[in-house]
Amino acid sequence: MTIASTPLTTDRAELLARLAQPETYDLLIIGGGATGLGTAVDAVARGFKVCLLESHDFAKGTSSRATKLVHGGVRYLAQGNISLVREALHERTTLLNNAPHLAQPLPFVMPSYRLLDTPFYGAGLKMYDALAGKDGLGRTEFLSKDKTLRLLPTVRTDHLKGGVKYWDGQFDDARLALALARTAAAKGALLVNYCPAKELLHTDGKVSGVVCEDAETGTRYEVHAKCVVNATGPWVDLFRQQDAEMLGKPVKPMVAPSQGVHVVVDREFLPTDHALLVPKTADGRVLFAVPWLGKVILGTTDTPRHDLAREPEAFEQEIEFILKEAGNYLCRRPTRADVRSIWVGMRPLVKPQDDDGENTKKISREHT
């Protein structure tokens, strides 16, 4: 029996009826964030029969709690990770071309307060341009003090020497995730949210599906597949551990979770269409102040987090850190009372071998 489905149907009964059919999928994906949804689109576009299960809303976790940037990794360039920067720049181009309604170029300005800052950082950003090649969004430009102030009118003026302007991208993370979900559904994939995978199924010592549960009714379903993809982000080790226990094999954690806090303040702190880049914070990271929907996003942090909360909360010291670091570059320092919103994204960083995962700032952002 075949049940027709419109793209990303909201008819719960129809979705569950499809889920209950005795079907063996080519690919079963656990997790409806950017990775899971992207995998679903790729697989179904190649003709595979795909089912995706999500325990909450699509893009509930990290995939809707980003800094809203499509960047090639300026910080990674400073670390000498050229291959990662080149890959990120390629992906930036792909996203800008594929979703121009959700992703656009964004100019950034890095103010300089020491005489050598402009040539030092400018040279690095020129290399950024070179790595982007024909896919560059605009040329890096060395700025005078006056032009820096025209582009960033609220930046701190004392000891300001000039600045550097470069280009990267900005996107709507949550809308992109939903666009991926709709695309996958339109091509025939079955996507069901609020239906968490509860346990893995095994056949001949290999994972062959999951038992999932409708969060509304508690009804359980067995879903079988030739291949199961664990795309649960920071929670990936929970299923890996379950699989290991079932097979009686030890397994080491793969992920070192890290949280990134974002603070939103009013646009008056940065009344411009240019983003501000703080090249080096007290903990050695970069910090962004990014215009977004009439407000300004300040962030982010990199703090190890092991409790894997579904609704991670910012530590007060993280909020104060962001406000202080941003305030060092603004003529008016934002205070705790100026904060309009806060969100936290969890990074599923791949833990290096023989590493306790406590210094997440140094963990590579490359995939394994």
Where would I find each of the regions flagged by the language model?
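Extreme N-terminal leader/targeting segments of oxidoreductases
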Residues: 1-27, 42-46
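Core beta-strand elements of the Rossmann-like FAD/NAD(P) dinucleotide-binding domain
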Residues: 23-25, 216-227
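Short hydrophobic core segments
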Residues: 29-30, 223-233
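Glycine-rich FAD pyrophosphate-binding loop
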Residues: 44-65
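Dinucleotide-binding Rossmann-like beta1-alpha1 core, especially the glycine-rich loop
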Residues: 68-151, 287
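Flavin (FAD/FMN) cofactor-binding and adjacent substrate-gating region
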Residues: 112-187, 192, 200-206, 293, ...
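C-terminal catalytic lobe of FAD-dependent flavoproteins
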Residues: 175, 183, 244-368
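Flavin (primarily FAD) binding-site architecture
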Residues: 230-247
